[in-house]
């Protein structure tokens, strides 16, 4: 049993055993980001450590993936969870879903004693929200991992479920975003003969590369895992380049499908493309990168407008009990319409696309917030 730490609450000096936890003023952060809830997770028996962040439930229960990642600090994990939860709220609002944004983040560390047990423990945490938070897979977690979580929670969507082709739904949305971006650049809607650089060939990047090849596009791709890259190249005919060389490829589109924050001032300056459209979350390292891309004549399709396919399917299955889940190509058409609207508004107003998308999403939240706030789950 852990030893109880005692502390004089009137003292202004942090307790020496907990001083390292005081890097973030959590309540100030919650007020600044308008967060509803932050839950810290700890299961000593399995080594589970992480956070669930719920940003906003005025439109409905929070939905967001769960990721397992090697963060340098707990602060970094919490900051990532917050950014992703806020983006999920906007993604749901922009897609017209009766849902809000949340995120689960697990810290990958040497102290994980039982991976399967850790995932079942995470499922129990999700279950404890009682339908306030729905989740599925994200970076670092496989379909089998999410199935483990599903064993202990009704509120977990398994991406490999035959009814829920989550990767396919998102991939079709990415292609829809690409068509809209090509058209906005004056290149027409067709992907036939277009050159597309795909960064990251995990489950999502591989699916996008396969669809692009089927559409007749030339795929240039990279992944830090040589074996994974080789398999995708063999099945799609993609030309492989070194991971750091993706920024220097002359192409029509750049498609980030790996980790967050890949678009920095430095990488944006190296791009030789007409547009950026990808499946990765939180692609911009900083808000000003959006404006830098615009100044360079590179169209940016905001990530949460593009990668909403999986969340749309999840919301339909869990919240609306819809059975029409097979026409995932139609989700691509919806994304194409949304991205077209964003890029046309950006061209007309001179505002960067990310700012336009944020405004459209926030406007969709104004009406619910103007009435009495609803705190899910309703009783």
Predicted regions, residues:
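Predominant activation on well-ordered alpha-helical scaffold segments within soluble catalytic domains
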Residues: 78-85, 116-127, 147, 171-179, ...
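Short, surface-exposed connector motifs at secondary-structure boundaries
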Residues: 129-131, 192, 213-218, 268-275, ...
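Adenosine-phosphate binding glycine-rich loop
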Residues: 182, 274-379
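Rossmann-like adenosine-cofactor binding region
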Residues: 224-301, 305
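N-terminal ligand-binding/catalytic initiation module
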Residues: 2-161
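Flexible, glycine/charged-enriched surface loops at secondary-structure junctions
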Residues: 92-97, 132-137, 187-194, 243, ...
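Glycine-rich phosphate/diphosphate-binding loop of Rossmann-like nucleotide-binding domains
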Residues: 165-255
